[in-house]
């Protein structure tokens, strides 16, 4: 297993919808509405992927796709990069930021939520109990978001960032989460 971790031809970019659902499930994303359903508006237009919106019966992308550059030059494929571009990547990161900081809420362009108030939110109740020990908080997020694969240098960067400012407990949790969704260990599977 450790040999595969260092093999440059092993690994894959996780699909946007998988990363989004992983965050939601890890932090018990739940509806604030009485009828308990959640509507993510405009996913297919912003992150180029949404449930039941694939362009063919086979998937969201061709299995033999390889992006230009090192991956295709070495004869490897990376199908999940077919739906990844500058705009969709930024939309996903912006969506993570809105979801983490405000919950599922309509933003300026009308995407993501359907209301001007939060339809659903992430539950930070467990994580708030870890804010007294920043390392425990980072280790917890490493486990639930990165599967325990967080590199030491990534962990140190996050701890330095958390120690560099005074946060309220909830702001510390949100700040740490915003850092985690940008990590290679969260976005790439080895």
Question: PLM ranges: what are they?
Answer:
Residues 1-190:
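Flexible, low-complexity segments enriched for small/polar residues
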């Amino acid at each position: 297993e450790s040999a595969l971790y260092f093999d440059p031809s092993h690994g894959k970019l996780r699909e946007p919808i998988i990363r989004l659902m992983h965050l939601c499930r890890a932090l018990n994303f739940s509806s604030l509405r009485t009828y308990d359903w959640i509507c993510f508006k405009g996913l297919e237009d912003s992150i180029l992927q949404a449930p039941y919106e694939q362009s063919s019966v086979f998937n969201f992308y061709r299995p033999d796709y390889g992006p230009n550059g090192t991956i295709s030059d070495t004869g490897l494929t990376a199908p999940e990069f077919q739906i990844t571009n500058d705009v969709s990547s930024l939309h996903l990161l912006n969506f993570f930021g809105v979801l983490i900081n405000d919950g599922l809420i309509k933003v300026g362009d009308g995407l993501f939520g359907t209301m001007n108030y939060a339809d659903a939110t992430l539950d930070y109740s467990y994580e708030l109990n870890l804010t007294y020990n920043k390392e425990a908080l980072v280790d917890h997020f490493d486990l639930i978001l990165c599967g325990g694969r967080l590199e030491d240098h990534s962990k140190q960067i996050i701890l330095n960032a958390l120690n560099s400012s005074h946060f309220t407990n909830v702001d510390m949790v949100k700040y740490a989460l915003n850092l985690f969704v940008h990590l290679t260990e969260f976005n790439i599977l080895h």
